[in-house]
Curated annotation (Swiss-Prot):
It is found in: Cytoplasm, Cytosol; Secreted; Nucleus; Cytoplasmic granule. GO terms for molecular function: growth factor activity; platelet-derived growth factor receptor binding; protein homodimerization activity. Residues 46-163 form the CUB domain. PANTHER family: PLATELET-DERIVED GROWTH FACTOR, PLATELET-DERIVED GROWTH FACTOR C. The keyword Cytoplasm applies. Gene3D superfamilies: Cystine-knot cytokines (2.10.90.10), Spermadhesin, CUB domain (2.60.120.290). It comes from Rattus norvegicus. Proteolytic removal of the N-terminal CUB domain releasing the core domain is necessary for unmasking the receptor-binding epitopes of the core domain. Cleavage after basic residues in the hinge region (region connecting the CUB and growth factor domains) gives rise to the receptor-binding form. Cleaved by PLAT and PLG. Homodimer; disulfide-linked. Interacts with PDGFRA homodimers, and with heterodimers formed by PDGFRA and PDGFRB. Interacts (via CUB domain) with PLAT (via kringle domain). SUPFAM superfamilies: Cystine-knot cytokines, Spermadhesin, CUB domain. This is Platelet-derived growth factor C. Residues 34-45 have a biased composition (Basic and acidic residues). Disulfide bonds join 104-124, 250-294, 280-335, 287-337. The gene is Pdgfc. Growth factor that plays an essential role in the regulation of embryonic development, cell proliferation, cell migration, survival and chemotaxis. Potent mitogen and chemoattractant for cells of mesenchymal origin. Required for normal skeleton formation during embryonic development, especially for normal development of the craniofacial skeleton and for normal development of the palate. Required for normal skin morphogenesis during embryonic development. Plays an important role in wound healing, where it appears to be involved in three stages: inflammation, proliferation and remodeling.
Amino acid sequence: MLLLGLLLLTSALAGQRTGTRAESNLSSKLQLSSDKEQNGVQDPRHERVVTISGNGSIHSPKFPHTYPRNTVLVWRLVAVDENVRIQLTFDERFGLEDPEDDLCKYDFVEVEEPSDGSVLGRWCGSGTVPGKQTSKGNHIRIRFVSDEYFPSEPGFCIHYSIIMPQVTETTSPSVLPPSALSLDLLNNAVTAFSTVEELIRFLEPDRWQIDLDSLYKPTWPLLGKAFLYGKKSKAVNLNLLKEEVKLYSCTPRNFSVSIREELKRTDTIFWPGCLLVKRCGGNCACCLHNCNECQCVPRKVTKKYHEVLQLRPKIGVKGLHKSLTDVALEHHEECDCVCRGNTEG
């Protein structure tokens, strides 16, 4: 009987010690979880929403010391003003577990654009400090992950700030009326407009609709237009590599030119002021001629007519005469490599 009593007493004491140890372990885990959630959200399916109206910062746990293992923290910064953006600046003290094969697989911090779910960047290691990141709207998401191995220090700290929206000018490109501008200044002002309607509104604010309607009425003689499209020759037996060289070496390609400069006209304004033309361009590395240096020159040149809006000062009175007109510009249809300077043979 005495032996049975001793066995029961020993079992009870052992159970008490086991329960105390389990309670202690549970308490430690709860304390660790509380520490993690103090600066973010541990569950990756949830996030801590941080409402901001000014500058501030978030950081890895225990920054600038070694961060804990097995951590997932998610923050979503939301600015109070819906019209602002958020800029993130990383502290120079940055260090996470090094990447493997140039990939941040284990410990990393990443920034996500919530509007479309795109990841702006993922960073780890300690080689370079990540650059500034800016949200598209008034919120941005940050996620920090560490695995169960090799925690590093100092972790990271991200400073956030508010970027106010830029004030857009609703006035015309020039504060002076068109009649008070010189032709060169007026040309610069005209260039800033995107559509004919905006341009006519600027030139004739009181009667712009009438001028715009009359602009397209066929009240003037229609000029002939010679839009010449040369046929591109194709060599059927050329090696593919040589064909690629021909395509990307000395060939006609798109260039934008100023109409006033091309026509050498300083007495009038054209809109649009620039047009695309075909001009010879590229290099002549494989020049077939026996010379020290080759240059790419046009071999066949044609004139093409482009219909544009012409603005000419009225004689004797203020204002501009507006009309649609054709301008002839040179287009290079074929190009060739020739010797620059003196040739030999």
